[in-house]
């Protein structure tokens, strides 16, 4: 064997030995795949409620304020001075008497319902009937009813309504009872009466209806039908709304803790949450201490309802708010 062939054979043997050693070595483990991040329980899902709701503008909301001629003085002027000044195009005042001066202050959005000024079930239902018809005429997406002792936070209201679709059956508010109301439904023609149970949102805290639901209510609510429907159960206006929505249409009241009436203990509302509420109220002469506990530049004698204090915290740039509020608001 020539010397060249011997060298080649040795090289082949060496290569074979190296390959044998490599085959005996353990194979390396595959690199682990990167893990998906653990879900964050506090993170809001990408598909949030707002994607299913409306992109609302302030003028999409119709706010009806129910009042009476005797409250056209300080009570209603307080609302015009505070929250209505921030939502003038949204707000319509429904009353029972003409008042040219107040009509001018309200920008022409005060409506004389020609209903009785006496606080009876029939008079209340008369006003609600007019409110409902005016809302349908407006073409707006949402109807919200409040009383003349409510402070409305327009920003909170718009934010809340934006989480729903106005095409869906939405009835939103706060019940004053912890159980459904039970009523006797009188059948036309003097037939057998039925017992019906349903929830209703108290008008004293305010409530809202989507246009989709309001249109379905039309056979029992439009063009004066609301009053005859109320006579079937002989209940006030807010109860009749609940009767139509739940008892006749089978929709449901969505209970919201953001609406407040004078019937609850308002001092129990946490002060840190007051500015996020949709509506507030106050106790009035019969219960003057039932007001929200909010600090402000006005004392209780200057601001017995606490509405001015709340307003200056929400809108410190208001010209009549104390300078302290305006300076603090500039740095927020």
From Swiss-Prot:
The protein, known as: Beta-1,3-N-acetylglucosaminyltransferase radical fringe
Reactions that this protein is recorded to catalyse: 3-O-(alpha-L-fucosyl)-L-threonyl-[EGF-like domain protein] + UDP-N-acetyl-alpha-D-glucosamine = 3-O-(N-acetyl-beta-D-glucosaminyl-(1->3)-alpha-L-fucosyl)-L-threonyl-[EGF-like domain protein] + UDP + H(+); 3-O-(alpha-L-fucosyl)-L-seryl-[EGF-like domain protein] + UDP-N-acetyl-alpha-D-glucosamine = 3-O-(N-acetyl-beta-D-glucosaminyl-(1->3)-alpha-L-fucosyl)-L-seryl-[EGF-like domain protein] + UDP + H(+)
Cytoplasmic side: 1-6
TM regions (residue ranges): 7-29
GO CC terms, sorted: Golgi membrane
Membrane topology (UniProt): Single-pass type II membrane protein
Temperature dependence: Optimum temperature is 37 degrees Celsius.
GO biological process: cell differentiation; nervous system development; pattern specification process; positive regulation of Notch signaling pathway; regulation of Notch signaling pathway
Manganese found in the keyword field: yes
Subcellular location as annotated: Golgi apparatus membrane
A Pfam family: Fringe
Keyword Glycosyltransferase: yes
UniProt cofactor(s): Mn(2+)
Residue positions binding substrate: 75, 148
EC class of the enzyme, as a word: transferase
Record keywords: Developmental protein, Differentiation, Disulfide bond, Glycoprotein, Glycosyltransferase, Golgi apparatus, Manganese, Membrane, Metal-binding, Neurogenesis, Signal-anchor, Transferase, Transmembrane, Transmembrane helix
Family as reported in the entry's similarity comment: Belongs to the glycosyltransferase 31 family.
EC number: 2.4.1.222
PANTHER family per the UniProt record, alphabetical: FRINGE-RELATED
Role description: Glycosyltransferase that initiates the elongation of O-linked fucose residues attached to EGF-like repeats in the extracellular domain of Notch molecules. Modulates NOTCH1 activity by modifying O-fucose residues at specific EGF-like domains resulting in enhancement of NOTCH1 activation by DLL1 and JAG1. May be involved in limb formation and in neurogenesis.
Tissues and organs where the protein is expressed, per its UniProt entry: Detected in all the examined tissues (12.5 dpc). High expression found in adult brain.
Active site: 238
Cofactor-binding details, from the entry: Has some activity with cobalt but not with magnesium, calcium and zinc.
Sugar-modified residues: 114
InterPro entries: Fringe, Fringe-like_glycosylTrfase
């Amino acid at each position: 064997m020539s010397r060249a062939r011997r060298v080649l054979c040795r090289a082949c043997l060496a290569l074979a030995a190296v390959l044998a050693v490599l085959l005996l070595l353990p194979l390396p483990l595959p690199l682990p795949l990167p893990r998906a991040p653990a879900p964050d329980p506090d993170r809001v899902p990408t598909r949030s409620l707002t994607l299913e709701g409306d992109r609302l503008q302030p003028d999409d909301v119709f706010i009806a304020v129910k009042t009476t001629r005797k409250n056209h003085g300080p009570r209603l002027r307080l609302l015009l001075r505070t929250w209505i000044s921030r939502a003038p195009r949204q707000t319509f005042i429904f009353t029972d008497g003409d008042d040219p001066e107040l009509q001018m202050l309200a920008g022409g959005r005060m409506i004389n319902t020609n209903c009785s000024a006496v606080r009876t079930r029939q008079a209340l239902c008369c006003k609600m009937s007019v409110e409902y018809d005016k809302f349908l005429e407006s073409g707006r997406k949402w109807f919200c009813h409040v009383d003349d002792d409510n402070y409305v936070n327009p920003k909170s209201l718009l934010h809340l309504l934006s989480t729903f679709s106005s095409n869906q059956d939405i009835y939103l508010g706060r019940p004053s009872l912890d159980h459904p109301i039970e009523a006797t439904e009188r059948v036309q023609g003097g037939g057998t009466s039925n017992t019906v149970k349903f929830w209703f949102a108290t008008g004293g805290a305010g409530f809202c209806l989507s246009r989709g639901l309001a249109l379905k209510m039309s056979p029992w609510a439009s063009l004066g039908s609301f009053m005859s429907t109320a006579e079937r159960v002989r209940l006030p206006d807010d109860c009749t709304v609940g009767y139509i929505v739940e008892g006749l249409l089978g929709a449901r009241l969505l209970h919201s803790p953001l609406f407040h009436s004078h019937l609850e203990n308002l001092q129990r509302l946490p002060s840190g949450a007051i500015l996020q509420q949709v509506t507030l109220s106050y106790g009035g002469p019969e219960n003057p201490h039932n007001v929200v506990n909010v600090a402000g530049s006005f004392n209780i004698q200057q601001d017995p309802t606490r509405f001015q204090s709340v307003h200056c915290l929400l809108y410190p740039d208001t010209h009549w708010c104390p300078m302290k509020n305006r300076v603090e608001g500039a740095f927020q």
